[in-house]
Amino acid sequence: MAGHSKWAQIKHKKAQVDAKKGKIFTKLVKEISVAARLGGGDPEKNPRLRVAIEKAREVNMPMDNIKRAIMKGTGELAGTTYEEVIYEGYGPGGVAILIEAMTDNKNRTVSEIRHLLSKHGGSLGESGCVSWIFEKKGYILVDKKTIDEDTLISVALEAGVEDVKNDPKEENYEIIVSPEQLNQVKTIIEKAGIPVSFAQVTMLPKNYISIEGEDAEKMLKLMDALEDHDDVQNVYANFDIPEEAMSKAEV
């Protein structure tokens, strides 16, 4: 997955740090509210809401905050209405970037996203320019130190996964599943006594672009800047960056 595992771990650590600052709460409240508005307030009947609540619990968001966000989404409480938007563009070295955002002011958000891309050597593109490069998948990471490959593959295949990858350069096994099966497969793996270090529905690139040196540094700074934006929920990119450069981005 050419660095996807490493970046997923970095994002996970940063989410924990952001949780201490309360920053991640704002983004999760938006996600919970929108999920509840679109699919109803019952997480048992709304998979997207269930995943959003799990993310909120991972960073210790108070249950009262979660309930209020759901009620704002269902209209039981007054609140801001957020609209989902997707921006597509390019980073240094021609890297494809897909940005998922939630905003109450599309004009403001697109202007700020365009500025961030330009500032870090990228550019905003037209709708559809890079989305074809990405596939929506469930993505699970398991630390190699916790289980041997044969045992994991046996459990994973029985759970109905699409693929198990063992990149010698990565610290984790990577498990690919359909988005709808993510929670089910995660539960099966954990019930088999195998700890899951990361699980999320994501957009996986079909191909990667190798960048290094100044382009790699600019790309990582751009990813940080985009993910730090209050309206941005997720950023996906198809970069392949050397391990030493990637390590500099760690918390």
From Swiss-Prot:
Q: Which GO terms describe its cellular component?
A: cytosol
Q: Which GO terms describe its molecular function?
A: DNA binding
Q: Does the keyword Transcription apply?
A: yes
Name the InterPro entries on file: Integrase-like_N, TACO1_YebC-like_2nd/3rd_dom, TACO1_YebC_N, Transcrip_reg_TACO1-like, Transcrip_reg_TACO1-like_dom3, YebC-like
Q: Which Gene3D superfamilies match?
A: 1.10.10.200, 3.30.70.980
In the record, the note on similarity to other proteins reads: Belongs to the TACO1 family.
Protein's UniProt name: Probable transcriptional regulatory protein THEYE_A1868
Question: From which residue to which does any coiled coil extend?
Answer: none
